Amino acid sequence: MDTKKDIKSLNLEELKTEMESMGEKAFRAKQMYEWMHVKLVRSFDEMTNLSAKFREQCKEKYEYTCVNPVRIQESKIDGTKKFLFELSDGNVVESVWMQYKHGNSVCISSQVGCRMGCKFCASTLDGLERNLTPSEMLDQIYAITRLTGERVSNVVVMGTGEPMDNYNLSLIHISEPTRRS
């Protein structure tokens, strides 16, 4: 069985190449990119300006990740919110949303678990399970944006895991939100 490509982890140029390989015009990539990274939809079904047939083809060929909130805790002191998100494989990661005068910051996870072994950190207790994909990192930001109704202005990669141990994927994640500004 072929593994489906993770469509949200593709940049715009890669998405154009994928669309052309499916016999679609290059503009289709921009439409999909906007649905995923600007409108923040949770599935192909929400991409209503794309034909039902094309959306079905996409479902067959591509994985469309989406994190689901398991628990949300809010500080009574400053309104900071801590999110526990379930990934598509059942693993969970934490993210935090913080409001400041200069804007809203989110702290996201880059791994499930951690291999660093820091004595002060609970993330390392079970070791490293796996790196998050760029789309799973983006999904944390997108879910928080949808759940709070607020725009995110700053992203910190300091949740579960060591971002430098997932460096290449973290760089991909960091570049995507800046493209959609």
Listing of model-derived features with the role each one plays in the protein:
Residues 1-104:
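Flexible, acidic/Gly-rich N-terminal and inter-domain linker regions that tether
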Residues 32, 114, 155:
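Residue-level signal for inorganic ion chemistry
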Residues 99-136:
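Canonical Radical SAM [4Fe-4S] cluster-binding loop centered on the CxxxCxxC motif
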Residues 124-154:
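Conserved alpha-helical substructure of the radical SAM core
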Residues 158-161:
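Glycine-rich beta-strand-to-loop/alpha-helix junction loops that act as flexible
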Residues 165:
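Hydrophobic/aromatic residue at the end of a short beta strand that borders the catalytic acidic motif
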Residues 172-181:
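Single conserved hydrophobic/aromatic residue that forms the stacking wall/gate
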